From Swiss-Prot:
Native organism: Saccharomyces cerevisiae (strain ATCC 204508 / S288c) (Baker's yeast)
Positions carrying Phosphoserine: 85, 92
Subcellular location: Cytoplasm, Cytoskeleton, Actin patch; Bud; Bud tip; Cytoplasm, Cytoskeleton
Name listed for the protein in its UniProt record: F-actin-capping protein subunit beta
Keyword Phosphoprotein set for record: yes
GO biological process: actin cytoskeleton organization; barbed-end actin filament capping; cell morphogenesis; filamentous growth
This protein's encoding gene: CAP2
Main subcellular localisation: cytoplasm
Length: 287
């Protein structure tokens, strides 16, 4: 694969309709199969869901980080669905036993976060080891996923990919690096006004912070500290990005509408633009 082909594929995806991102991505992979692995790991697409039959058909979120072949690992039962053959399972990625305990704690904790902040939706957390040694509370990575749908086909997907590594400056300090992508789709129809408004796109930001943890404490306490630190970071990131979407991007969208409207209907268009912006913000706040 050449860098030029990969860059061209990413540039093309940025210019195409974001509502057909998955279809466009599949078409590019079909045209250039050698780009498949890099595109799948680099392009964030709206999250899909599966049901865990081993845990009362509880829903979980699917992404490239819990995928093996065409199956996705559930964070609830640690099982792949659709089920893999015994031979395939031998090579399938699973977190180590200690890291799996942290994964369970993280899923339970972020499920509470989801209920409080999203008032619905689905959350999933997946972790993986960064080295082959037994996990003892040090270096690991993972992803925290949230999805909230509305009955009007609007949806919010947030993907937080993170790494937790020992800080080079102190053995009791950890470096948390989080890359967050928000995928937003707002679809509003007013039947009384015979109008339809749709807004789609994604926004990515990165943050990094060093936080001290007392490594002399029991492993369960260290796990709780990691989850609390990640929760605090993700809460701050999501709040900042929501505000950024409302106060910057939607304002810019309204300005573009204003600049392109017909001068002959300036007054009515301005009112329509204000209504459209208010409708977009209400749609975002409901997710």
């Amino acid at each position: 694969m050449s860098d030029a082909q990969f860059d061209a594929a990413l540039d093309l995806l940025r210019r195409l309709n974001p509502t057909t991102l998955q279809e466009n991505l599949n078409n590019l992979i079909e045209l250039q199969p050698n780009l498949a692995q890099d595109l799948l790991s680099s392009v964030d697409v709206p999250l899909s869901t599966q049901k865990d039959s081993a845990d009362s058909n509880r829903e979980y979120l699917c992404c490239d980080y819990n995928r093996d072949i065409d199956s996705f690992r559930s964070p609830w039962s640690n099982t792949y669905y659709p089920e893999l053959s015994p031979k395939d399972l031998q090579d399938s990625p699973f977190p180590s036993a200690p890291l799996r305990k942290l994964e369970i704690l993280a899923n339970d904790s972020f499920d509470v976060y989801r209920d409080l902040y999203y008032e619905g939706g689905i959350s999933s957390v997946y972790l993986w080891d960064l080295n082959e040694e037994d996990f003892n509370g040090h270096d690991f990575a993972g992803v925290v996923l949230f999805k909230k749908n509305q009955s009007d086909h609007s949806n919010w997907d947030s993907i937080h990919v993170f790494e937790v590594t020992t800080s080079p400056s102190s053995p009791d300090s950890f470096n948390y690096r989080v890359t967050t992508t928000i995928i937003l789709h707002l679809d509003k129809t007013k039947t009384d006004q015979n109008s339809h408004m749709m807004l789609s796109g994604n926004l990515t930001r990165q943050t990094e912070k060093d936080i001290a943890i007392d490594m002399s404490r029991p492993l369960d306490v260290i796990f709780t500290s990691h989850v609390a630190n990640l929760g605090s970071l993700i809460e701050d990131i999501e709040s900042q990005m929501r505000n950024l979407l409302e106060t910057v991007y939607f304002e810019k969208t309204r300005d573009i509408f204003h600049q392109t409207k017909n001068a002959a209907i300036a007054s009515s268009a301005e009112e329509a633009n204000k209504d459209a912006q208010a409708e977009v913000i209400r749609g975002l706040q409901s997710l």
